[in-house]
């Protein structure tokens, strides 16, 4: 299994969901939109995901599962797949990172790393 696949690019956009959050109860909800761009010459399939979510107190949560949002999408060459999901933290700032396990046309599994990205309510410096 390859450690990294440079032909897959990941873009992440995050947003604080104020209407679902309750700071008094230490509940801060964030949405994220992820676009997976397949820059390779073959179709790939996203098989599973693994997230490490860390809040600003250092509390960590691992999330693993098949596919994303109930799907194991095929992503054709030079195409992209976008999905949205969310998470809740006990602090107003946190970080997510992880990886996708992918499968190429030859049946070879490889890992696509997802670089750390910040979850934060607006105007927080932490």
From Swiss-Prot:
InterPro entries: ApaG_domain, ApaG_sf, Uncharacterised_ApaG. It holds the Pfam family DUF525. Coiled coil: none annotated. GO terms for biological process: error-free translesion synthesis. Signal peptide: none annotated. Transmembrane segments: none annotated. Residues 2-126 form the ApaG domain. This is Protein ApaG. It comes from Vibrio parahaemolyticus serotype O3:K6 (strain RIMD 2210633).
């Amino acid at each position: 299994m390859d450690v990294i696949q440079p032909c897959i690019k990941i873009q992440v956009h995050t947003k604080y969901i104020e209407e679902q959050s309750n700071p008094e109860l230490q509940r801060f909800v964030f949405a994220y939109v992820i676009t997976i761009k397949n820059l390779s010459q073959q179709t790939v399939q996203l098989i599973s995901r693994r997230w490490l979510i860390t809040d600003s107190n250092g509390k960590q949560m691992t999330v693993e599962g098949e596919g994303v949002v109930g799907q194991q999408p095929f992503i054709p060459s030079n195409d992209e797949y976008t999905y949205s999901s969310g998470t809740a933290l006990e602090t107003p700032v946190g970080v997510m990172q992880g990886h996708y396990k992918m499968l190429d046309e030859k049946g070879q599994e490889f890992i696509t790393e997802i670089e750390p990205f910040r979850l934060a309510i607006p105007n927080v410096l932490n």
